[in-house]
Every structure is written in C-alpha cells, then in structure tokens.
Amino acid sequence: MRKSARGQVCTEAGAGASGDWQDMSSAWGKRAWQDLNSAWGKRGWNDMSSAWGKRAWQDLNSAWGKRGWQDLNSAWGKRAWRDMSQSPWGKRGWNDMSSAWGKRGWNDMSSAWGKRGWNDMSSAWGKRGWNDMSSAWGKRGPEKWANFHGSWGKRAAEPDYEEIDAAIEQLIPIQQLSDNERMEVPEKKAWSALHGAWGKRPVKQAQYNSGSYYWKREPAWTNLRGMWGKRSAPDADAVDDDHESSARDEA
C-alpha cells in the first residue's frame, strides 16, 4: 500500500510538471510561441519580407534615395567612374600625370630633384659625399678612431703610473691607509684611496662593539669634524694638564 501510494504521488507530480511545461509552450505572457510566427507587434514576420517601413526590400534594389544602385555605376556626382579614368580629373588626366606633375614629370625626377639629381646624391650631399663621410666625421679620419677610446673614458693600454701616484698623494696620504689597502698596483691603490673621499663606509672592526664606530668614516673624514661643528676629540696634553691640576687641588 505504501509503495503504491508513493508511486501515485510521483506520477501525479510528474504529470503536474509536464502539464506546466506544456502550458508554457502554448501560452507565455498571454501569447503563444506559435502565435509569434504569424504576428509580432501586430506585424507578421512574413510581412517584414515584403514591406519594412512602407518600403520593401525588393524595392531597395531598384531605387534608394530616389536613385538606384544601377544608376550609381554610370554616374556619381554628375561624373561617371569611367570618365574619371580617361580624360579629366581636376582638369588634368591620370595619363597626363605620368608626363608632368607640377610642371615636372616623374621621369624627370630621376635626373633632377631640387636642381640636384638622385645620382648626384651619391657623390655629394650638403657639399660632402656619402663616400667622403666614412673618412671624415667631425674632421677626424679612420686612423684616429682607435684613439677615441681614451677620450671616451676607456682605459688606455699603458697607463701613466706617475700621474696616478701624484693623484694619490693629493687625495689622501699613504700613512692613513691600512696595511691591506697598501697595494703594489698604482691603479688599485688609486681606487682604494678614493673610497674615503666618496664617503664609503669602512668595515666595522672587532674591538668596537658599541656600534659608534660603525657610523664613523675614514680618518680623513673624522679630521673634518671640527669644521662641521662637531666636537673634536680632546688632546692628550689637555688631559694630562687636567689630571695634574686635579692632583694639586687634592694635595
């Protein structure tokens, strides 16, 4: 009995659902789908093929804007396409353009252009030929190109060590450099000397654990502290004098 009751309920539910779908196919929004084939907006689809906006599609093939498509092939703006290719266009024909253009023909352009021919351009351009440009650019010949690398900042093959030594002596005294910075090669010595002048931070030493030395710079920089208003380190003689005066006071 229970199984039969359940089956009856399922069949009734399925029948109700199928009835709803069938009802939707016949009427939706109070208008059937089949009805749309014959009329839509009080005008049928079949009627659209014969008339649209009081003018049929077939009528457009013969006349459009009071002028047919076929008529446009023969005349357009009171001048035919065939007429454009033959005699005049702006009072000058296309064929005439090959012989003269601005009182100078295209063929004439190969021999003269601005009173100078194209062939002449290979030998002279701005009173200097292209071939001449390879030998002179800024009044410098090809044999001097190799010497350009010196002026462009490239290191020469044989550097002048005497000038480098003189520059080192002017930048920083050799006594202020550490042992590992005293190199034999003058070029490396010059680079190592410049890091003090550029303000590069030195390596922190092991005996300075407070971290104050880490913010100090090279000795050449620390000597400038008095000029920048920073308090300089007290002299040893001044410290001894202070101790002696304090000892006398205690005595």
Swiss-Prot record:
Keywords: Amidation, Cleavage on pair of basic residues, Neuropeptide, Secreted. This is Prothoracicostatic peptides. It is found in: Secreted. Disulfide bonds: none annotated. GO terms for cellular component: extracellular region. The modification Tryptophan amide is found at W89, W152, W198, W228. GO terms for biological process: neuropeptide signaling pathway. The keyword Secreted applies. Signal peptide: none annotated. Residues 1-77, 93-138, 156-187 form a propeptide. Prothoracicostatic peptide 5: Expressed in antennal lobe (AL), corpora cardiaca (CC), corpora allata (CA) and gnathal ganglion (GNG) (at protein level). Expression in AL detected in all animals, in CC, CA and GNG in most (at protein level). Prothoracicostatic peptide 6: Expressed in antennal lobe (AL), corpora cardiaca (CC), corpora allata (CA) and gnathal ganglion (GNG) (at protein level). Expression in AL detected in all animals, expression in GNG in most animals, in CA and CC detected in some animals (at protein level). It comes from Agrotis ipsilon (Black cutworm moth). Residues 1-22, 227-251 are annotated as: Disordered.
